[in-house]
Curated annotation (Swiss-Prot):
Exhibits low sequence similarity to canonical beta-catenins but displays functional and structural similarities so that it appears to be a highly divergent beta-catenin. The gene is sys-1. Changing K539A: Abolishes interactions with pop-1. One of its GO terms (molecular function) is RNA polymerase II-specific DNA-binding transcription factor binding. Interacts with TCF transcription factor pop-1 (via N-terminal region); interaction is direct. Transcription coregulator. Part of the Wnt signaling asymmetry pathway, probably acting downstream of putative frizzled ligand mom-2, Wnt/frizzled receptors lin-17 and mom-5, and dishevelled homolog dsh-2. Activates or represses target gene expression, depending on upstream Wnt signals and interactions with transcription factors, such as pop-1. Required for the activation of Wnt-responsive genes in the E blastomere; thereby leading to a role in endoderm specification and gut development. One of its GO terms (biological process) is embryonic digestive tract development. This is Beta-catenin homolog sys-1. Disruption phenotype: RNAi-mediated knockdown reduces the difference in the relative level of expression of helix-loop-helix protein hlh-2 in the SMDD/AIY neuroblast by comparison with the SIAD/SIBV neuroblast. Low level of ectopic expression of tbx-35 in the E lineage. Ectopic expression of irx-1 in several posterior sublineages of ABp. Loss of ref-2 repression in several posterior sisters of the normally expressing embryonic sublineages. Guts are missing in about 3-10% of embryos, but this increases to 100% in transcription factor skn-1 or Nemo-like kinase lit-1 mutant backgrounds. GO terms for cellular component: cell cortex; centrosome; cytoplasm; kinetochore; nucleus.
């Protein structure tokens, strides 16, 4: 009870047991000031313990230590101080014991202090009033012996009391009791922080609060008081990060700031703090716009200069972990936007950019720096352009001060450090793991930074593709995966047409061939597909490097889609096969005759490799991709459209034999290629309509009709197509629209005409828009008008008003 009679309360509610009248005294030998020597360089007045008032003063026999010479005693004390200073500055107390040293050390140091003070415990029986433990008084580190009547102040059972050999008791030496009092010590530290100017006491308070939170005692705080308690601790952290008015050694600040920053770091991920994480974010809000601003203090802690200091380096790492925890842990979009806005100020960006200077060793770069950059530029196009161009013209190579050039240097510099190291030593080599992480984060940041065609072209012009292919030579799966992903992103750059790829492309093809990772194969085949499009010299390089054989090998090694049960795996296989076929289509276009007569001649090796794509195994696999049902795969629509395109080009290629194509029967559906094409045609109309897939669906329908027409013309399959027409709706319904392409109109009319030629009964079943069809007979395109007249003649005349609409024209 307080002197006023009111119960004392802390952030956790009422204290667990009554406090002594003098509330500023907490008897405990577990306080850090008892177990740690005063910091060198700080004044330590020679405070002396107070003797018990009933103790009769008598001079004990001189102890062995008292008989030592002053010089020998001074030497012994210096050795003790040196031993205590050798303890690690950042060692954390055991969660089960709190901030105190082990019990045997407590007992030894207590007895040592007693012997040094010539306390006559060993020569007298236990007095009726036993001396209590030591404590700091009024927030400082002065030690005193409190005379306490144990019969009046025995607040705990005997199991929580520790007895000395002569029967006296030492209240708080018991570890269980120390755990009970850590909450009181933390509450008092929070309450007295701003009234305690003494630096050492502030350090002890910071350690006490940190220990209290580390031991999950913070969860005992009353929920009603939790917001206020969190804010009090955040205010303490803010105040503690400010420099003290007196000059203190940097090692002192390193200890103080490390403990305060560790408290803040724990606030960013503790589940009990998550409802109040907005209070942590508000700390980064601009306040004073001066050196005392919290953001300015944080920038000082992560300065590149501190990375060379063995003590302050730990504080900088704590700050980076705080940033990382907030960015990765906060899910509220409004709060994330607010935090990103707080971080967009010049000093922070400049401080972080210093780590990317060429003269900085890559081992000094914390991977969290890349995460911070990604966070602040993710939705800011203007900031991305500034980092890339520094207000220079976009049609020129990026300036040396831009982030692209710096990140390329980081990439190459890190690779040079890891090139000679054995990748198998990665689990035991933290330096190697750190450098690999730096390279991967560099790839990720570049992927976000290259947000438009100008940025991508600038990256390619600065030899970014060459840098990536150099780095991915190191045999690490994560590194190769990240590098190939970035290659895929820049693969459609216009600047690649002027980039020498004679050495780059063969290396990538070998990498795709030997690497087992699906992500690497997907990114590599995607890069190949884009880079050969509309670039004839790149096609020649790829063909000379056996790219066609590689495409066949990749498709052959994957199982059928209906044999894959894992949905992500199935979707990735869809995308890989699609990339391979798209690349093949770019090659086939060179050998198909065009109206202007520009056609390249394929060599014997190319002809042999292309013909492998109509072999039985490949045909069956591609047919199953067209017709397999019962799977929700996002990439299936694009894959089926690409397969249809591949069959169209293969059948139009002069040197590809067509005779045996329709003789291949799939085991599941017992149908040849025509049946699978009709299945894909019916499937596409069952897919939901949305703006993202609308164009792909229309493309699939157009390619279905085109392929059926090619089969009729190239393979003589008119009768077979007519027989399979029972499974599809009337294609004439596809012509109801104003945006239909003339080529598609002609193909639909011809296919329907051939179907009715071999199956006239279909005319009685199909429901058509006769006025629309009659209007097409007057189309300005003579081929369309001719096909419409031929088709119209196959339908019975059953509309007396048909002639009224016969003069309509479609353009």
């Amino acid at each position: 009870m307080h002197s006023t009679g009111e119960p004392q309360r802390g952030p956790a509610g009422p204290y667990h047991h009554p406090m002594p009248y003098h509330v500023d005294q907490i008897p405990t030998t577990s306080h850090p000031s008892w177990h740690q020597a005063p910091h060198p360089g700080l004044p330590t007045p020679p405070y002396h313990p107070q003797q018990h008032p009933n103790y009769i003063s008598m001079q004990p026999p001189p102890s062995q230590q008292q008989q030592m010479t002053p010089q020998a005693l001074s030497t012994q004390q210096q050795q003790q101080v040196q031993q205590q200073q050798q303890r690690q500055l950042y060692s954390s107390p055991s969660p089960s014991r709190g901030p105190a040293a082990p019990a045997q050390n407590q007992k030894f140091r207590t007895e040592q202090w007693i012997n040094n003070q010539a306390w006559p415990y060993s020569q007298s029986p236990a007095p009726p009033v036993a001396p209590s433990v030591m404590s700091y008084h009024q927030g400082d580190d002065r030690m005193s012996m409190l005379s306490v009547n144990t019969t009046m102040t025995n607040q705990f059972p005997d199991s929580q009391r520790c007895y000395s050999s002569n029967g006296s008791t030492c209240e708080n030496v018991n570890p269980e009791m120390m755990q009970m009092n850590i909450t009181q010590a933390a509450e008092q530290a929070i309450r007295l922080w701003f009234n305690t100017p003494d630096p050492m006491q502030r350090l002890h308070m910071a350690k006490t609060i940190r220990t209290w939170i580390r031991q999950d005692k913070f969860a005992q705080v009353d929920q009603a008081n939790m917001p206020n308690c969190v804010q009090q601790i955040l205010n303490i952290i803010y105040d503690g990060l400010k420099p003290q008015p007196v000059q203190l050694p940097i090692s002192y600040y390193a200890q103080l700031w490390y403990n305060l920053l560790d408290i803040l770091r724990r606030f960013t991920f503790l589940p009990i703090i998550s409802p109040y994480i907005h209070q942590v974010v508000q700390m980064f809000c601009p306040r004073e716009n001066g050196p005392q601003d919290f953001r300015e203090l944080i920038c000082n802690l992560i300065s590149l200069n501190w990375q060379k200091d063995p003590h302050m380096k730990h504080c900088a790492n704590q700050v980076f972990q705080i940033f990382n925890c907030i960015i990765m842990g906060v899910k509220n979009e409004k709060l994330r936007t607010e935090f990103a806005q707080h971080l967009k100020f010049e000093k922070l960006v400049g401080t972080l950019s210093e780590y990317f200077n060429p003269q900085v060793h890559p081992g000094m770069i914390n991977p969290a720096i890349f995460i911070i950059f990604r966070f602040i530029i993710s939705k800011d196009t203007r900031l991305k352009d500034y980092f890339i161009w520094n207000n220079n013209p976009h049609d020129q190579p990026p300036p040396p001060t831009g982030l692209i050039i710096k990140l390329n240097a980081v990439m190459i510099g890190s690779y040079r450090l890891i090139a000679g190291q054995n990748p198998e030593t990665l689990p035991q080599n933290p330096e190697l793991a750190h450098l690999i992480q730096v390279i991967i984060r560099t790839f990720d940041l570049l992927g976000l930074l290259l947000h438009d065609s100008d940025a991508i072209d600038g990256f390619v012009r600065s030899d970014g593709v060459g840098a990536i292919t150099t780095v991915v030579q190191y045999p690490n799966n994560d590194l190769i995966r990240a590098g190939c992903k970035l290659l895929l992103q820049v693969s459609d750059a216009k600047a690649l047409a002027k980039t020498p790829l004679e050495n780059i492309l063969p290396f990538l093809l070998r990498l795709i061939e030997i690497h087992p990772d699906d992500e690497v194969i997907y990114s590599g085949t995607g890069f190949l597909s884009n880079v050969v499009a509309h670039k004839q010299h790149v096609k020649d390089i790829a063909i000379r490097s056996n790219a066609i054989f590689l495409l066949h090998t990749i498709i052959s090694k994957y199982p059928r889609l209906d044999e894959l049960t894992d949905a992500p795996k199935r979707n990735r296989v869809c995308e890989i096969i699609c990339n391979c076929l798209r690349t093949l289509n770019n090659f086939l276009m060179m050998w198909i005759p065009t109206p202007n007569g520009e056609t390249k001649t394929a060599g014997p090796n190319e002809k042999q490799q292309v013909c492998k794509f109509i072999e039985i195994d490949i045909l069956k696999k591609l047919m199953s991709c067209l017709s397999c049902e019962g799977m929700d795969t996002p990439g299936l629509l694009e894959l089926r459209s690409t397969i249809l395109r591949s069959f169209i080009l293969l059948l139009r290629t002069p040197f590809v034999p067509k005779d045996g194509v329709l003789n291949v029967i799939d085991e599941n559906r017992k149908e040849n290629l025509i049946g699978h094409i009709c299945a894909a045609y019916s499937w596409v109309f069952r897919q939901p309509n949305n703006t993202r897939t609308q164009s792909t669906k229309q493309q699939l329908v157009e390619r279905t009709i085109s392929l059926l027409l090619v089969l009729m013309e190239q393979c003589g399959a008119e009768k077979e197509v007519a027989q399979y027409s029972y499974s599809i709706d009337c294609p004439l319904n596809l012509l109801n629209g104003n945006q239909v392409k003339p080529t598609f109109i002609h193909n639909v009319l011809v296919v329907c005409d051939k179907i009715l030629e071999h199956c006239p009964t279909r005319a009685d079943i199909w429901t058509i828009d006769r006025p629309m069809l009659e209007g097409l007979t007057n189309h300005r395109n003579s081929d369309i008008a001719k096909a419409a007249n031929s088709l119209l003649s196959r339908f019975p005349e059953n509309d007396l008003l048909a002639g009224i609409f016969s003069n309509r024209e479609y353009f």
